[in-house]
Swiss-Prot record:
InterPro entries: DNA-bd_curved-DNA, DnaJ_C, DnaJ_domain, DnaJ_domain_CS, HSP40/DnaJ_pept-bd, J_dom_sf. SUPFAM superfamilies: Chaperone J-domain, HSP40/DnaJ peptide-binding domain. GO terms for molecular function: bent DNA binding; unfolded protein binding. The gene is cbpA. The lineage of its organism: Bacteria, Pseudomonadati, Pseudomonadota, Gammaproteobacteria, Pseudomonadales. GO terms for cellular component: cytoplasm; nucleoid. Pfam families: DnaJ (PF00226), DnaJ_C (PF01556). This is Curved DNA-binding protein. GO terms for biological process: chaperone cofactor-dependent protein refolding; protein refolding. HAMAP family: CbpA. Residues 5-69 form the J domain. PROSITE patterns: DNAJ_1, DNAJ_2. DNA-binding protein that preferentially recognizes a curved DNA sequence. It is probably a functional analog of DnaJ; displays overlapping activities with DnaJ, but functions under different conditions, probably acting as a molecular chaperone in an adaptive response to environmental stresses other than heat shock. Lacks autonomous chaperone activity; binds native substrates and targets them for recognition by DnaK. Its activity is inhibited by the binding of CbpM.
Length: 319
């Protein structure tokens, strides 16, 4: 088992605050998002970033990782957890998901609170022989909230004998529909889909906690989506038609003459769906991007414009 230095994975210092850690995670999640990155190992790096944020984004796990880091583990080098460490996890163990053996050996008894690809935790029930409930954090991409197709999930459930004693774990696979209007952190109950009961007891339930995966193009505000639309200066000045991506295909957006950076254009019905299936808005936020003036002809054009244009962007300073 190799040691994983989660600070190195996210590219932050051990002294980084919560804001810096979250920003680093979002940057990597966007860069290696499976829908965007063409790198061969993008999915693995995406999962690795999620695992790092699962630990460093949780104060308790981060403190424990900092403690075990003192034992001299080096990133990518063989590592063995100190004797007795695993016992700190307490009751039923966390099994697999997409987290590494290193994570499981250090936090084996804890839940997988932020794993966007899913990770089960078992909650021990003391009453009767009812099967254990299983908690699964499930990554949902924005496109999936509009899809009518089922999503296949796999997770670990504990097995018990007739005496209610745990005998091991088994993998269970389900096809689930993502309901319209789901939001980050929402908890969905699937009755009877948890661990089997013993001695004729009822099955436990499966609880899905939705985690909306970061998208490389869109930010989310409620059921509205925000996309930044880069414009050339002449497009903003003269007006243009620009092809803008949405969750269900591109649209042609009309840019009016004299548009400014920061302006928002509303596109009705191109946001996320609510519980009733009604969709929010897409807001296209304009951003004027300056081209490089690296060659002589470009500089001549800018020089002529500066000489002929009666424009002072700082007139408010003279008031």
């Amino acid at each position: 088992m190799d040691f994983k230095d989660y600070y190195k994975i996210l590219g932050v210092e051990p002294t980084a605050d919560e804001k810096a850690i979250k920003a680093a995670y979002r940057k990597l999640a966007r860069k290696y998002h499976p829908d965007v990155s063409k790198e061969r190992d993008a999915e693995e790096k995406f999962k690795e970033a999620n695992e790092a944020y699962e630990v460093l984004g949780d104060a308790q796990k981060r403190a424990e990782f900092d403690e075990i880091r003192k034992y001299g583990g080096q990133h990518g080098r063989p590592f063995q957890a100190p004797p007795g460490w695993e016992s700190r996890g307490g009751g039923g163990g966390f099994e697999g998901g997409d987290f590494s053996d290193f994570f499981s050996s250090i936090f084996g008894g804890r839940s997988a609170g932020g794993n966007p690809f899913g990770g089960a935790r078992q909650q021990q029930r003391s009453a009767g022989r009812r099967g254990q409930d299983v908690e699964l954090e499930l990554a949902v991409f924005l496109e999936e909230t509009l899809s009518k197709e089922s999503k296949q999930i796999s997770f670990q459930v504990p097995q018990t004998n007739a005496m209610g004693q745990r005998t091991g774990f088994t993998t269970k696979t389900l096809n689930v529909r993502i309901p319209a209007g789901v939001t980050d952190g929402e908890r969905i109950r699937l009755k009877g889909q948890g661990a089997p009961g013993s001695g004729g007891g009822a099955n436990g339930d499966l609880f899905l906690t939705i985690r909306m995966a970061p998208h490389p193009l869109f930010d989310v505000e409620g059921h509205d989506l925000i996309i930044t639309v880069p414009l050339a200066p002449w497009e903003a000045a003269l007006g243009a038609k620009v092809a803008v991506p949405t969750l269900d295909g591109k649209i042609n957006l009309t840019i009016r003459p004299d548009s400014q950076s920061g302006q928002r254009l509303r596109v009705p019905g191109k946001g996320l769906a609510n519980k009733q299936g009604e969709r929010g808005n897409l807001y296209a936020q304009l951003k004027v991007v300056m081209p490089p003036a690296s060659d002589e002809s470009a500089r001549e054009l800018w020089t002529k414009l500066s000489e002929k244009a009666a424009f002072n962007p700082r007139t408010q300073w003279s008031k």
